[in-house]
């Protein structure tokens, strides 16, 4: 009996500790958060940063970790350049999606010809810049406030996005309204966490970088 009571108390403590990390935002806080992210996104013309991407599979305990460099240029250009453990590139120049593995030639697919790529580009670009995502009518959005950051949970409404993700979670710095990390939760329960670091803003980035050959 005592053991059962002890376990119950531990469980309740853990649940309280987790929930205490973030509190639901008030309506006034929501407006303030959206305003700050929109302002920060508007001020950001380009971005370059290192990233660490961790893939957690629902049916395995092991995690798969990738590292690389991400480039973004307003409005619709993004490049994920993976450097570890394997070299590959996923990039978009606003018109096409480019996929390249190792030294092979890139595969090219028009964004508009594929609804999935079109929606994916919005999620990826919005996920790293905040641009057009936090206030999008295409998502049911929940805002939460933590000690040093905001947590924004977006549940997609469109089928094309639902087929990819059950939710997108953004973690945003309170100090400068910059996206710190993105969590992509798939329908299968698999989770991908992308953490951004060593961020450089508004630097010169050549357009050719987004058109992989």
Report each predicted region and the residues it spans.
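Sec-dependent N-terminal signal peptides
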Residues: 4-14
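Flexible, processing/modification-adjacent segments and terminal tails
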Residues: 22-26, 38-43, 55, 63, ...
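Gly/Pro-enriched, hydrophobic low-complexity segments
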Residues: 132-213
């Amino acid at each position: 009996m005592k053991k059962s009571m002890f376990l119950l108390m531990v469980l309740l403590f853990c649940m309280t500790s987790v929930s205490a990390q973030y509190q639901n935002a008030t309506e006034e806080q929501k407006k303030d958060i959206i305003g700050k992210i929109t302002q920060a996104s508007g001020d950001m013309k380009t971005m370059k940063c290192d990233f660490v991407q961790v893939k957690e599979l629902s049916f395995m305990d092991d995690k798969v970790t990738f590292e690389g460099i991400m480039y973004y240029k307003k409005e619709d250009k993004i490049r994920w350049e993976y450097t570890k453990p394997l070299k590959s590139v996923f990039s978009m120049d606003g018109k096409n999606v480019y996929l390249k593995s190792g030294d092979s030639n890139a595969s090219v697919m028009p964004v508009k010809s594929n609804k999935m790529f079109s929606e994916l580009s919005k999620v990826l670009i919005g996920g790293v810049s905040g641009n057009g995502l936090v206030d999008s009518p295409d998502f049911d959005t929940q805002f939460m406030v933590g000690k040093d950051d905001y947590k924004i949970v977006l549940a997609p409404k469109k089928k094309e996005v639902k087929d990819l993700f059950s939710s997108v979670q953004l973690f945003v710095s309170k100090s400068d309204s910059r996206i710190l990390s993105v969590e992509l939760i798939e329908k299968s329960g698999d989770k991908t966490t992308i953490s951004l670091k060593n961020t450089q803003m508004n630097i010169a980035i050549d357009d050719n970088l987004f058109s992989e050959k």
